[in-house]
Amino acid sequence: MNLRFELQKLLNVCFLFASAYMFWQGLAIATNSASPIVVVLSGSMEPAFQRGDILFLWNRNTFNQVGDVVVYEVEGKQIPIVHRVLRQHNNHADKQFLLTKGDNNAGNDISLYANKKIYLNKSKEIVGTVKGYFPQLGYITIWISENKYAKFALLGMLGLSALLGGE
């Protein structure tokens, strides 16, 4: 076993993870969104978006219009919600407030908002506006998050390939 060769493999794995992290951060800066890519986790936006679709977000537009699909985060909940803008209000200070609703839901989202709010503050709660999507590719992440053994198996396979892989 050559120590120099093993250290080089470890360095390559570290470089791979650092490159992925830098790519994600660059994408976040370019889109002005902390989560520039999200996966649809429920059927609340059917038929427009199905469970497992990957959505690409953009957060550099000044105002959202009625009909735009936005992703927002509610205080106290970690899962972003993908819904359509039902109403929008602007005040004199260039702030925008949005009321949203899932296409497949009967009513609006007021019951989902934190602290009994009736509108979302775009600058504080909107993660981004959907600008594109890739159908069903997100099922991989859903499967990994819902299957506790899949996480360990995936990490194990990555570790084994890094250790056993040669040039």
From Swiss-Prot:
EC numbers on record: 3.4.21.89
Effect of D109E: Nonviable. Loss of catalytic activity. No effect on protein stability and interaction with SPC3
Family matches, as Pfam families: Peptidase_S24
Active site: S44 (charge relay system), H83 (charge relay system), D109 (charge relay system)
GO molecular function, one term: serine-type endopeptidase activity
UniProt effect for mutating D109N: Nonviable. Loss of catalytic activity. Loss of protein stability
GO biological process, one term: protein targeting to ER
Cytoplasmic side: 1-9
GO cellular component terms, A-Z: endoplasmic reticulum; endoplasmic reticulum membrane; signal peptidase complex
Post-translational modification: N-glycosylated.
Disruption phenotype: Leads to accumulation of core-glycosylated glycoprotein precursors.
Glycan-modified residues: N121
Lumenal side: 32-167
Compartments reported by the entry: Endoplasmic reticulum membrane
Reaction equation(s) it catalyzes: Cleavage of hydrophobic, N-terminal signal or leader sequences from secreted and periplasmic proteins
Membrane protein topology class: Single-pass type II membrane protein
Residue stretches spanning the membrane: 10-31
EC top class, as a word: hydrolase
Chain segments carrying region C-terminal short (CTS) helix: 153-164
Stated consequence of mutating H83K: Nonviable. Loss of catalytic activity. Loss of protein stability
Record-linked InterPro entries: LexA/Signal_pep-like_sf, Pept_S26A_signal_pept_1_CS, Pept_S26A_signal_pept_1_Ser-AS, Peptidase_S24_S26A/B/C, Peptidase_S26B
Entry similarity comment: Belongs to the peptidase S26B family.
Subunit structure: Component of the signal peptidase complex (SPC) composed of a catalytic subunit SEC11 and three accessory subunits SPC1, SPC2 and SPC3. The complex induces a local thinning of the ER membrane which is used to measure the length of the signal peptide (SP) h-region of protein substrates. This ensures the selectivity of the complex towards h-regions shorter than 18-20 amino acids. Interacts with SPC3. SPC associates with the translocon complex.
Domain remarks in the Swiss-Prot or TrEMBL record: The C-terminal short (CTS) helix is essential for catalytic activity. It may be accommodated as a transmembrane helix in the thinned membrane environment of the complex, similarly to the signal peptide in the complex substrates.
Note: Present with 3150 molecules/cell in log phase SD medium.
Protein's name in the database: Signal peptidase complex catalytic subunit SEC11
Organism of origin: Saccharomyces cerevisiae (strain ATCC 204508 / S288c) (Baker's yeast)
